[in-house]
């Protein structure tokens, strides 16, 4: 709950479902969180985001500063998309979100019904941000990675 003196950003009240990892997606959702959006980062419950282990440097609590910096101001939830209950929770999050951000390989979320077409069937007003290494034309099926590109 907000205190009367708490400054709210211009995106206060906007809910972002963040299915991204590493840099491009987390950086985009970090900027939205910095402006007051509620960002809910979905991570693998066993491993978390790959960058949780990237370092050095690490904080005095042993956390990777890279992960901490690009995931600041976010909430996090561990969901295994291969588990039916967790998948339902992820789909429900996408159904209620104002924005969905993902950077899976093209087609990677189709089998989970978290792709653009599936999400917009139940949430037609959603802003769906799909980040890929090589766009939607030639080479779209290739995996892209920040340092590769």
Q: Over which residues does each language-model region extend?
A:
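N-terminal helix-loop segment corresponding to the beta1-alpha1 unit
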Residues: 1-149
